[in-house]
């Protein structure tokens, strides 16, 4: 959840019984922590509850790949046993994590990526649907579940989960759980700016648009006057650069570096003057800034209210406590 996953938020989610997922670039670049010390801080704040780590594993840069490998190794040394991978082949992460008894779930938006993840040995899939913030998929939650159900792995619903009703609907479809981003930005612990949080509270589904101006591919953001002035499509030079194989590599690197700065600045800027605010359609169900733990507990209570599911139960994952293996 770059750039909003600060240590206090991640720890609060875990302390309440969820799995707070740290984002290493957010932890180090946005919030200024040494990676290892940041993990130790989150363990301390959460009371030693399980933490997860997001490993964006696209291999466009050798330097970035080496840094991500080091981050994964440090996280494992510090007892992290749950990893969410995205944008690449997760095999090397799976090998390292399974060696110590951990679990790897992989972000997917369609069947071909799910099959590649399964072939790499991942333990579950994060099914990113078209209601998600950031880089959303193209299918509804139900369509994606139906497409992935026979892969044979637990499925987590990502996108559109802003209130208990949406959470229960995901479980009733057959998902083993949900992943939430936008809902946790509008919390007391999140360090995102007040204008960003207020924009989430004020937005409806129709206020979520997809812009190519940040990363070169569509990203779900809140429609604002700034977004409307900038437009939603990448410029002609960028589109040309993204078409060639070699040019595409360099253009995506430029976009990645620029977007890190843009999103960091926009998320922390209290003036809201240049507001690239990532969010999904779950904004429709978010009406208050609340403690993260209260949200987790309320959703858990709603989940327990489902007395009987028409779908077979999914086997509970292995123990994810720090150090468990």
PLM feature segments, named:
Residues 1-154:
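Active-site entrance/lid segments in N-terminal catalytic domains of soluble metabolic enzymes
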Residues 158:
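Short hydrophobic "strand-cap" motifs at the C-terminus of beta-strands
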